Design a protein with these regions (language model features):
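Helix-to-loop junction immediately C-terminal to a conserved catalytic motif
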Residues: 61
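Conserved ABC transporter NBD signature motif
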Residues: 69-82
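Conserved ABC ATPase "signature" region
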Residues: 106, 117-132
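Catalytic Walker B motif of ABC-type/P-loop ATPase nucleotide-binding domains
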Residues: 161-164
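Helix N-cap at the start of a conserved alpha-helix in ABC-type nucleotide-binding domains
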Residues: 172-174
Length: 227
């Protein structure tokens, strides 16, 4: 099944996947997935555990290679070639509990020598956090931890944001704050791909909803973004 938005005169696609499959031994995590992602849109991936959502996200991020099929980003780049233009936030925040938010970001910024990056304090402000907060991350609420993780992703000023379960373990208020943040990024023409079990939480910003079932695209439906 080929999943794509209706054809229209538009900029170069953010991503094009054609018949992408991924095998782990004899298990097919993805089966002939074809999808086009347009720039400046928000795509929400839903499906049961094991449907292939996180696998698809990791392939887009260049962290996994497909077993077959082709994927091109920003025209004609392979994911590993486009890594500098991609921001990937994993389900488990990659942060250090003993460091403050700004100390965490300074460390991760040091891993990108020579690459244009946001200042750590600026990245924290973008997600609504106070960079002067002198508290170790281990004392942050889950919502603050998730926003710090998102700030880490923003350091490299990515054009494509890949967010694996960004609303995980959040209370309702924190989830609403995250949705508001993502709405702002979407309006700045970033492309966003979200995996979630809570479709209703992402509904206000979803341009398209892609439902995976047993590694295949079962539905690719227009959303009703309100933000």
């Amino acid at each position: 099944m080929t999943a794509q938005a209706p054809e229209a005169a538009s900029p170069v696609l953010c991503a094009r996947l054609e018949n992408v499959s991924k095998l782990f031994g004899s298990f097919a995590a993805l089966r002939q997935v074809s999808v086009n992602l347009e720039p400046g849109r928000c795509y929400v991936l839903i499906g049961e555990n094991g449907a292939g959502k996180s696998t698809l996200l990791r392939i887009l991020a260049g962290l996994l290679r497909p077993s077959s099929g082709t994927i091109r980003l920003f025209g004609d780049e392979e994911p590993h070639e486009a890594r500098a233009r991609i921001g990937y936030m994993s389900h488990a925040p990659m942060l250090y509990d003993e460091l403050t938010g700004v100390e965490n970001l300074r460390y991760f910024a040091s891993l990108y020598p020579g690459r244009a990056c946001l200042e750590p304090a600026e990245a924290l402000r973008e997600v609504g956090l106070d960079p002067t907060l002198n508290r170790p991350l281990g004392q942050y609420s889950q919502g603050m931890r998730q926003r710090t993780s998102l700030a880490r992703v923003l350091l490299s000023v990515p054009e494509l944001l890949l967010l694996d379960e960004p609303f995980s373990n959040m209370d309702v208020e924190s989830a609403h704050q995250m949705v508001d943040l993502l709405a702002g990024f979407r309006q700045s023409n970033r492309t966003i791909v979200i995996t979630t079990h809570q479709r209703e939480q992402a509904a206000p910003i979803a341009d398209w909803v892609l439902r995976l079932k047993a590694g295949r695209v079962a539905d690719f439906l227009p959303g009703s973004p309100r933000l």
